[in-house]
Amino acid sequence: MTSRLRIAVQSKGRLAEGGMDLLKRCGLRFAYGRDKLHQRAENMPVDLMLVRDDDIPNFVGSGACDYGIVGENVLAEEQAAGGRARELEVALRLGFAGCTLKLAAPDDGSIRTVADLEGKAVATSYPALTAQYIADRGVKAEIVEMRGSVEVAPRLRIADAICDLVSSGATLQANGLKAFETVLRSEAVLIRRKSGRADDTDAIANILMRRSEGVIASSQTKYIMLNAPTDRLGAIRALLPGADAPTIAKVAGREDVVAVHAVCRERVFWETLEALEKEGARAILVLPIEKMLA
């Protein structure tokens, strides 16, 4: 009997949506039943465990699950706290759910560097990671653990500064705070135990890893098609962002024009298209790539 690969995924929220979308784009189909904790793939020996995000490192570290999709910030906090999470490693960076863990303090105050936190109180939902970061820089500060609304701590005089996740910075600004130090740049990651699991799930894991890499690559890659004058081909090729060697083909009935097809592994901006047009490129098409195996 084939063993089933077990993957822990956040039960709700941005990571849940991104994780499920990734797995579906990898070709997995799930039968959704009444069980809100467990989902079973119909077409591959894969089971999902839908749990809280901060439980995922423990599920993987204990061996209850083979892999987990979790925010790097959660993994870093659990590893800083010690225990089973230290036996985990990042198998793949997934490229979504990006955020930044930052230190911030009142905009009208005197705290502007980590050194200024000496003898101060710092409120955070990431106590182990924050304490480790500050201590590694030779500073002694009191860590005040909070489970939510961290940004109000200085205003309520619970703490002098905070360490919290920041996306746009609007919440900090609304509370009169200014970020002064980046502790961690985070995104969704696929985690596993360093020791692994020696059985027939390795083949399934390798297939999913390969497909995941293809999905991630395709989301960051575009397919460009255009017609180019033969005498401007060199200049046009130089403008194609991050392109592998393009395919050059003849255009029926034209000796002075060729068709250029290229896979571009960088973002394609309007400015790029305008520059291509200026060099004589015509009929420029930029297409998304759904699946890709490099």
UniProtKB/Swiss-Prot annotation:
UniProt keyword list: Amino-acid biosynthesis, ATP-binding, Cytoplasm, Glycosyltransferase, Histidine biosynthesis, Magnesium, Metal-binding, Nucleotide-binding, Transferase
Cofactor(s) needed: Mg(2+)
Protein name (Swiss-Prot/TrEMBL): ATP phosphoribosyltransferase
One MF term in the entry's GO annotations: magnesium ion binding
EC nos: 2.4.2.17
GO CC terms, sorted: cytoplasm
Organism field: Maricaulis maris (strain MCS10)
PANTHER family: ATP PHOSPHORIBOSYLTRANSFERASE, ATP PHOSPHORIBOSYLTRANSFERASE ATP-PRTASE
Entry similarity comment: Belongs to the ATP phosphoribosyltransferase family. Long subfamily.
Summary of activators and inhibitors of this protein: Feedback inhibited by histidine.
Task performed by this protein: Catalyzes the condensation of ATP and 5-phosphoribose 1-diphosphate to form N'-(5'-phosphoribosyl)-ATP (PR-ATP). Has a crucial role in the pathway because the rate of histidine biosynthesis seems to be controlled primarily by regulation of HisG enzymatic activity.
HAMAP family reported for this sequence: HisG_Long
One GO BP annotation of this record: L-histidine biosynthetic process
Localization, UniProt: Cytoplasm
